[in-house]
Swiss-Prot record:
SUPFAM superfamilies: NAD(P)-linked oxidoreductase. GO terms for cellular component: nucleus. Its EC number is 1.1.1.-. The active site is at Y63 (proton donor). InterPro entries: Aldo-Keto_reductase, NADP_OxRdtase_dom, NADP_OxRdtase_dom_sf. GO terms for molecular function: oxidoreductase activity. Belongs to the aldo/keto reductase family. It comes from the Eukaryota. Keywords: NADP, Oxidoreductase. This is Probable aldo-keto reductase 5. Substrate binds at H130. Pfam families: Aldo_ket_red.
Length: 345
C-alpha cells in the first residue's frame, strides 16, 4: 500500500479557485450508501481530512436531504470554515414522491439562500447545478447564478452532468469554474467530448465516483456487504449479470496494483490524478483508514506505459450496465430549450 503524503494544491478552472488536489465527497456520510455514520465519527473524519490537507469538501442539499449540509455546518465551526473550499449543489428535489430537477431563477435563489443558512456560512465557494433542468434555458439558470456571484453569496459557478453544448451556452453567460462528472476507469465516456470542451474553455474537472462507487476498493464482494438501503444495490453495474463480467476489470487492476505495491483503489485513483492538474477527484469514504489510503494514491506514480496498460484494460464500453439509475439524468440528456423560448413566470 502506498503511504499518504502531502496533498498538493491545484488551480480549478480559470477564475482563481485553488483547492486540494484531492477532495472529499461527503455524500456517503449521510445518504444513499446505507445507514448514515454517527455524527461524531463523521465530523472526526472530516476534521482528519482537513488536517491531512484534503480541504475541498463536496456536499449537496439533496444529500439526506439536507442533513449532509447540516453535518458540514457542525464540522466547520470554530474557525474550520476558513481552512476549506466548500462546494455544494442545488437542482434535485423530491416532490410528491418523485425526483424533480429545478433550474428556474426563483428556485435557484431560494436553494442558495437555504444552503447558506443550513451550512451557516456567508458565502459558498463553488455552487453547482446538480442536474440540468431541461425545461429551462441554461442561460436563464446561469443568469441567476451570476447575480448571486455579484451579491457575494457564491464565489464560483459549477455544473454537474452537463453536455458539451450546455457547458458552452452556460459559459457564454458567466465563466464556469468546474464541471463535476463521473470519471473513472469504469466510466470513460466523458473523454470523447466533455473533457476536451472543458479544457478548451478553461473549466476545471471534478471527478466524482473515481473509485467506481467503491468497486475498485472491494471488487464484486462489495455488493455482498451493502446494507439493504444502499442505493448501489439498484445500480445496473452491480447487478449479478453485469457484475460477473465487470469483475474481470477489478481482477486485472488488482493484479497490476500488486506489482506496483499499492492497493487496487490507489491504482484506480492514481489513474484519475494522472489525467492532469485540471482534474480533482473527490472520493468519498466513511473510514479514516480508507481516507488515508486515498491520499496515498497521490504518491503513486504511473509511467506512460502503465497508463496505457490501464486504459487498454478499461476501454470505453468494456464495463457492462449503465452507471446511473434511470431517474437520474446524465450529460447525455441534459440539453435545454433555446433562450428565445423562455417566458418568465
Amino acid at each position: 500500500m502506498a503511504e499518504a503524503c502531502g496533498v498538493r494544491r491545484i488551480k480549478l478552472g480559470s477564475q482563481g479557485l485553488e483547492v486540494s488536489a484531492q477532495g472529499l465527497g461527503c455524500m456517503g456520510l449521510s445518504a444513499f450508501y446505507g445507514t448514515p455514520k454517527p455524527e461524531t465519527e463523521a465530523i472526526a473524519l472530516i476534521h482528519h481530512a482537513i488536517h491531512s490537507g484534503v480541504t475541498f469538501l463536496d456536499t449537496s442539499d439533496i444529500y439526506g436531504p439536507e442533513t449532509n449540509e447540516l453535518l458540514l455546518s457542525k464540522a466547520l465551526k470554530d474557525g474550520v470554515r476558513e481552512k476549506v473550499e466548500l462546494a455544494t449543489k442545488y437542482g434535485i428535489r423530491y416532490a410528491e414522491g418523485k425526483v424533480e430537477f429545478k433550474g428556474d431563477p426563483a428556485y435557484v435563489r431560494a436553494a442558495c439562500e437555504a444552503s447558506l443558512m443550513r451550512v451557516d456560512v456567508a458565502c459558498i465557494d463553488l455552487y453547482y447545478q446538480h442536474r440540468i433542468d431541461t425545461r429551462v434555458p441554461i442561460e436563464i439558470t446561469i443568469g441567476e447564478l451570476k447575480k448571486l456571484v455579484e451579491e457575494g453569496k457564491i464565489k464560483y459557478i459549477g455544473l454537474s452532468e452537463a453536455s458539451a453544448s450546455t457547458i458552452r451556452r452556460a459559459h457564454a453567460v458567466h465563466p464556469i469554474t468546474a464541471l463535476q462528472i463521473e470519471w473513472s476507469l469504469w466510466s470513460r465516456d466523458v473523454e470523447e467530448d466533455i473533457i476536451p470542451t472543458c479544457r478548451e474553455l478553461g473549466i476545471g474537472i471534478v471527478a466524482y465516483s473515481p473509485l467506481g462507487r467503491g468497486f475498485f476498493a472491494s471488487g464484486p464482494k462489495l455488493v455482498e456487504n451493502l446494507d439493504n438501503n444502499d442505493v448501489r444495490k439498484t445500480l445496473p453495474r452491480f447487478q449479478q449479470e453485469n457484475l460477473d463480467h465487470n469483475k474481470i476489470l477489478f481482477e486485472k487492476v488488482s493484479a497490476m496494483s500488486e506489482k506496483k505495491g499499492c492497493t487496487p483503489a490507489q491504482l484506480a485513483l492514481a489513474w484519475v490524478h494522472h489525467q492532469g492538474d485540471d482534474v480533482c477527484p473527490i472520493p468519498g469514504t466513511t473510514k479514516i483508514e480508507n481516507l488515508n489510503q486515498n491520499i496515498g494514491a497521490l504518491s503513486v506514480k504511473l509511467t506512460p506505459e502503465e497508463m496505457s496498460e490501464l486504459e487498454s484494460l478499461a476501454q470505453p464500453g468494456f464495463v457492462k450496465g449503465e452507471r446511473s439509475i434511470s431517474i437520474l439524468t446524465t450529460f447525455k440528456n441534459s440539453e435545454t430549450p433555446p433562450l428565445s423560448s423562455w417566458k418568465a413566470a
